[in-house]
Amino acid sequence: MSLIKIIAITGMPGSGKGELAKLLREKGIKVITMSDVLREKYYKEAKEGERLMDFAKRIRELYGKGAVAKLCIEKIGKEEIVAFDGVRNWEEIEEFKKIGNVTIIAVHSPPKLRYERLLKRGRKDDTLTVEGLMKRDWEELEMGIGNVIALADYILINDSTIEEFKSKAEELLKRIL
């Protein structure tokens, strides 16, 4: 497999990673949402009553911290450019570097705004209390997401309207695609 162009999207829950992924899809770029790939495995292999976050930790303990990235790589196909939405740790970046040239984009939003978004989003595995959301943030940070955000090539600030975020994202994508 020759080297491909990889866009690694990272950010805390509710930061706007999905909105950036949507823009990339609109440009015809294949986006693989890492949590969807993980959920696929979770529904097949999770223990009775096991939370998705606990399943993710267990998978990484069994197969290494880059385990979810390896599962995602299998879904690339023949694409020359692909985006991975939801990179959680540096080991995943290292897996992606084995097959492509990686550009990391971190999406950042203030916690209060992210919590509001997550409460509105209502995804099945989203917790519905501020305390639960704060706990999830710490679990993400323990997984290593802070290192990926800190070492990102670009940081998109998402603290205003969706229109303003899309405009900033479009400008960035023009430069890197």
From Swiss-Prot:
Lineage: superkingdom: Archaea
InterPro entries: NTP_hydrolase-rel (IPR022970), P-loop_NTPase (IPR027417)
A single GO molecular function term of this UniProt record: ATP binding
Binding-site residues for ATP, renumbered to this chain: G11, M12, P13, G14, S15, G16, K17, G18
RNA-binding found in the keyword field: no
Protein's UniProt keywords contain Acetylation: no
Keywords of this entry: ATP-binding, Nucleotide-binding
Family in the record: Belongs to the UPF0200 family.
HAMAP family given in the database record: UPF0200
UniProt protein name: UPF0200 protein STK_09500
Species, as recorded: Sulfurisphaera tokodaii (strain DSM 16993 / JCM 10545 / NBRC 100140 / 7)
